[in-house]
Regions:
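A cross-family phosphate/adenosyl-ligand binding-site feature
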Residues: 7-11, 58-68, 76, 107-108
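Helix-loop-helix hairpins and the membrane-proximal interhelical loops
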Residues: 1-60
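Membrane-interface alpha-helices at helix entry/exit sites of multi-pass transporters
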Residues: 60-64, 101-121
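Hydrophobic/aromatic residues in alpha-helical transmembrane segments
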Residues: 46-50, 67, 95
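Residues at alpha-helix boundaries and the short loops/turns that link adjacent helices
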Residues: 16, 89-90, 106, 127
Length: 128
């Protein structure tokens, strides 16, 4: 059976864009944002906590759920680092140094915007 690369890519895209997969991707993203805001509960702990919920899912939905959760925890740990001075994970330790002092001076929005812009640029650069 000879399948071209384009046929396989179209099949993979159709599987990815099914509403059930998009729902689990969105749920993983929302839960990952909530877990990332809590200091000490990062991506690895979140994946370990939510792994039992994936046992009854098909492989694609479970992967979409875990991918959504893992992708946003390093972005959402910026919130406690800037606002409270407590790094959510080790990835946000440097954010505490500049971001929390900016928040003390009333520039929390500017610190969060800079952190999210850097996260966006890094994510896009890493994707390509």
């Amino acid at each position: 059976m000879d399948a071209s690369l384009l046929d396989v890519a179209i099949t993979a895209l159709s599987v990815l864009l099914e509403p059930e997969r998009l729902f689990y991707l969105g749920m993983g993203t929302v839960i990952g944002l909530a877990l990332g805001i809590m200091p000490g509960v990062g991506g690895v702990a979140g994946l370990a906590l939510l792994l039992p919920f994936t046992f009854n899912l098909d492989a694609y939905s479970a992967f979409a759920f875990m991918l959504g959760l893992g992708a946003v925890t390093s972005t959402s740990d910026t919130i406690p680092a800037v606002l409270f001075g407590v790094p959510g994970t080790s990835a946000s330790q440097a954010t505490v140094l500049d971001g929390h002092s900016m928040a003390k001076n009333g520039e929390a929005g500017r610190a969060l915007s800079a952190a999210y812009a850097a996260s966006l640029i890094g994510g896009l650069w890493g994707a390509f």
